[in-house]
Amino acid sequence: MPKKPAQSDSTEQSVSFESSLSELESIVTRLESGELPLEDALNEFERGVQLARQGQQKLQQAEQRVQILLNDSADDAALTPFTPDAE
């Protein structure tokens, strides 16, 4: 009998960037309130780190997709590498 993927794996993949960001903002608010017991705060922090990493990965994937689409464009315009700190 084939193994089913872990529930958390399939859940993580199906969660949208926006819902992850919303959950992360909620976690930050609860942590900043200072009212959580230590164990709960650590659990929330751990989940927040996980969400932040997932969000960063999704953003990187989106950036790569945009670069691929722009590189495949017919006008062959020169692209400047994306630098998030540039203004």
Curated annotation (Swiss-Prot):
Enzyme Commission number(s) from the entry: 3.1.11.6
Domain of life, per lineage: Bacteria
EC category name: hydrolase
One Pfam family it belongs to: Exonuc_VII_S
A GO MF term: exodeoxyribonuclease VII activity
This protein's record includes keyword Hydrolase: yes
Catalyzed reactions: Exonucleolytic cleavage in either 5'- to 3'- or 3'- to 5'-direction to yield nucleoside 5'-phosphates
Keywords carried by this UniProt record: Cytoplasm, Exonuclease, Hydrolase, Nuclease
GO cellular component: cytosol; exodeoxyribonuclease VII complex
GO-annotated biological processes: DNA catabolic process
Main location: cytoplasm
Compartment(s) of residence: Cytoplasm
Family label: Belongs to the XseB family.
Subunit structure, as described in the record: Heterooligomer composed of large and small subunits.
PANTHER family: EXODEOXYRIBONUCLEASE 7 SMALL SUBUNIT
Function: Bidirectionally degrades single-stranded DNA into large acid-insoluble oligonucleotides, which are then degraded further into small acid-soluble oligonucleotides.
Protein name as annotated: Exodeoxyribonuclease 7 small subunit
Gene source species: Serratia proteamaculans (strain 568)
Gene giving rise to this polypeptide: xseB
